[in-house]
Amino acid sequence: LLGLPNAGKSSLLSAITNAKPKIGNYPYTTLTPQLGIIRNYNQEIVLADIPGLINDAHKGVGIGTRFLGHIERCKILLHLIDAKSPNPLKNYKNIIKEITKYGKGLEKKKQVLIISKADLVSNEELKVIVKNIEEYSKSSVLVSSSINKIGLNELIDVLFTKLEKLDNENNNKETKEKKWSP
């Protein structure tokens, strides 16, 4: 789970997993990565909630490089964008800038974009936010509210589907790379 401080990452982790992270309405409630597990039939996904990233996190500000290092091992980035923030598109761009400047391929990882706290804005505001981020990112955007349980099942379905597809692609790539020799 990736985003600015107070974007709703811990609330989402708590809403869709068995984790009970500390949740507060102030930045830096999460100080260390928190883990939770989503189970779906015979599959499970481990979600990692990392502390919020701030400007210049890639330089180590707010011990950002330590947090970014944790997501190097993640297969997919769940990018939360707070609907209630003054400029959600700018917030999205800031996080993309930080993971790009950090390097190590983070910007190339698959992402699921989620507008969080959707219950706190009007439908009209939400449509504008979604449109702006979809146009900029060239990706579809999910809408959620952890408190009101909006969009959570869809998010879980998308996450399992994307991970299965990614695992299949990686398995096919590994099979092609292995050469048989008697």
Question: Model-flagged regions — what are they?
Answer:
Residues 1-61, 65-76, 81, 156-157:
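Conserved G1/Walker A P-loop phosphate-binding module
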